[in-house]
């Protein structure tokens, strides 16, 4: 085995098998595990996926939402143990791989048309 095959086999052990099919433009609810003191809880973070990056164990999504008039973006590693679950709330119809133009838009201009041809 060469080095690349060894790395892929080690990464394959840590991949999450039950991730939903997600695309840029989808509205998702990401459950993030948070440890406070001795307790662990799951905090939901809901927003629109504006970018997806890489593949394999390094696959990331950038989720954007507007909270109290301020745009907040978080980058999540999909295969991280900190991610408890990912739930697709709504499918979006977009024609771009990256939706960075939404950063400059405010209010109703940030809406994305809903897509019905893909199941939730």
Curated annotation (Swiss-Prot):
Keywords: Ribonucleoprotein, Ribosomal protein
Source superkingdom: Bacteria
Pfam families linked: Ribosomal_L19 (PF01245)
The keyword Protease is assigned to this record: no
GO cellular component: cytosolic large ribosomal subunit
GO molecular function, one term: structural constituent of ribosome
Keyword S-adenosyl-L-methionine in record: no
GO biological process, one term: translation
Family, per entry: Belongs to the bacterial ribosomal protein bL19 family.
Described purpose of this protein according to its UniProt entry: This protein is located at the 30S-50S ribosomal subunit interface and may play a role in the structure and function of the aminoacyl-tRNA binding site.
Protein name in UniProt: Large ribosomal subunit protein bL19
């Amino acid at each position: 085995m060469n080095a690349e095959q060894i790395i892929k086999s080690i990464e394959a052990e840590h991949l999450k098998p039950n991730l939903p099919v997600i695309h840029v433009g989808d509205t998702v609810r990401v459950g993030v595990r948070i440890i406070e003191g001795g307790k662990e809880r799951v905090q939901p973070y809901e927003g629109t996926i504006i970018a997806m990056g890489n593949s394999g164990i390094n696959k990331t999504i950038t989720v954007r939402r507007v909270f109290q008039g301020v745009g907040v973006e978080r980058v999540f590693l999909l295969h991280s143990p900190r991610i408890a679950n990912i739930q697709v709330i709504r499918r979006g119809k977009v024609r771009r791989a990256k939706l960075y133009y939404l950063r400059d838009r405010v209010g109703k201009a940030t809406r994305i048309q809903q897509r019905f041809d893909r199941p939730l």
